[in-house]
Swiss-Prot record:
Residues 204-383 are cytoplasmic. This is D-lactate dehydrogenase. The keyword Cell division does not apply. Binds 1 FAD non-covalently per subunit. Binds 1 Zn(2+) ion per subunit. It is a multi-pass membrane protein. Its cofactor is FAD; Zn(2+). Induction: Constitutively expressed.
Length: 443
């Protein structure tokens, strides 16, 4: 009897398909998926426990699968084994009195948003695509455009139910914001990308519903001018979003969205979103005092949606042309220097680099476009680029995670950290069955 036959006695087993073979990682850098794997779709932690206990005894790799929206190859099954999909783990309950939602790992961002709204609450950060799942967002510590004001996924996870590699079910945290009760295993699991345990359920913090927005679009002559404005605005207030786009990114967003941006002038453009009109007014004055070409305020939903659409469609316009999506994060005051020096580096390698991102928190999205013979020089360029980010006080990924794509840079740039991570992995998963080859190399 094969191990697949044995597994089918525990849970229904499905054959491999492309729906579980890939995620959103650009194909040129995506890890190669295994041809042979099976898919299981457990409904609860008890079923997950039985699957993992079996897999651990047989030393069979298990690859976790949420919404498949990741950009670092974290959900790609790179070896023959089991793809564990959380799509049936959709339990969702809102405890409005305590302002929390208890979610199965397969609950999507849209389902969480809608449930919170029905109870007069909100989930503010919006850290991923609407089809991203709670489990996946926790596993990557997803961020998004509102991180400056509302933080990342880590700031909303109050408790977790998870299953260890040997099948043990653990519960960490509670329904409370405060927790000073020993080592924070909760925060060790957040951002672990499925390599330490399988997240099955989470208690998510909710907030009051957000107020009406005011959106500012502000072109600047230079990136330095724009970033001076970012630093000054963020020093005095916290916008819901504080985005930047270089001119080429704006042009791409316009083309794909079919919308017209407010100005064709300027090297850099800022997009600010406020919940307070008074703050928006003060930010506009700051921008004008720091050399803005003009300040455009959108107060109607139609005008706001038009501006947000230009920003939101940039990647769609680049998707088929990029080698990959880089998301280094640097201190906000260093964005202009990082942008200038990364462009100089790209020019040395003959690479066209399109840049935009979350200016308020320093998360820079860069898209190197495909060029002839890219395989010979691109990875050397990427290492130099990420080394530059680290030299400026930054990190190699702000929100997309390491997955299978940035392993070598993590190991080379943070060797002491990498070794500690290997030891932690060995403690949680000594047989290395959980998402092997992701975040840390095979043990």
């Amino acid at each position: 009897m094969s191990w697949i036959d044995e597994l089918s006695k525990i849970v229904e087993v499905f054959p491999p398909s492309d729906a579980y073979r890939f995620d959103e990682t650009p194909p040129l850098v995506a890890p190669r998926a295994a041809e042979n794997f099976v898919v299981v779709k457990p409904s609860n932690s008890e079923e997950v426990s039985a699957i993992l206990k079996f897999a651990n005894e047989k030393s069979i790799p298990v690859f976790m699968r949420g919404g498949g929206t990741g950009l670092s190859g974290g959900a790609v099954p790179t070896e023959e084994g089991i793809v564990l999909s959380t799509e049936k783990m959709t339990e969702l309950e809102v405890d409005a009195d305590n302002r929390v939602a208890i979610c199965g790992a397969g609950v999507t961002l849209k389902q969480l948003d809608d449930a919170a709204f029905r109870h007069g609450l909100s989930f503010p950060p919006h850290p991923g695509a609407e089809t991203a799942t709670v489990g996946g967002m926790i596993a990557t510590n997803a961020g998004g455009v509102r991180a400056l004001k509302y933080g990342t996924m880590r700031n909303y996870v109050l408790s977790l139910e998870a299953v260890l590699a040997d099948g043990r079910i653990i519960n960490v945290g509670g329904k409370t914001i405060k927790n000073s009760s020993g080592y924070s295993l909760l925060h060790l699991l957040v951002g672990s990308e499925g390599t330490l345990a399988v997240i099955t359920k989470a208690t998510i913090r909710l907030f009051p519903q957000m107020r009406d927005m005011t959106v500012l679009a502000i072109p600047f002559p230079t990136m330095e001018d724009a970033m001076n404005c970012v630093v000054e605005v963020a020093r005095k207030m916290l916008p819901m979003a504080l985005e930047f786009m270089e001119k080429r990114a704006v042009e791409i967003g316009e083309k794909v969205s079919g919308e017209r941006w407010v100005s064709r002038e300027g090297e850099a453009h800022l997009l600010m979103v406020f919940e307070s009109f008074d703050e928006a007014e003060e930010a506009a004055k700051i921008a004008q005092s720091l050399g803005a070409i003009d300040v455009y305020a959108a107060t109607t939903k139609k005008d706001q949606d038009r501006l947000l659409k230009v920003r939101g469609m940039i990647y769609e316009g680049l998707r088929k042309e990029v080698i990959e999506v880089l998301d280094a994060c640097v201190p906000p005051a260093k964005i202009a220097e990082y942008w200038r020096r990364s462009n100089e580096l790209a020019e040395e390698y003959g690479i066209e680099l399109i840049t935009y991102g979350h200016a308020g928190d320093g998360n820079v999205h860069q898209h190197p476009l495909v060029y002839e013979g890219w395989e010979k020089s691109y990875f050397e360029f990427r290492k130099s680029l990420l080394s530059l980010a680290v030299s400026l006080g930054g990190v190699i990924s702000g929100e997309h995670g390491i997955g299978a794509v940035k392993l070598s840079e993590l190991e080379e740039l943070f060797p002491e950290q990498f070794e500690l991570m290997r030891q932690i992995k060995l403690l949680f998963d000594p047989k290395n069955i959980l998402n092997p080859g992701k975040v840390v190399r095979k043990l």
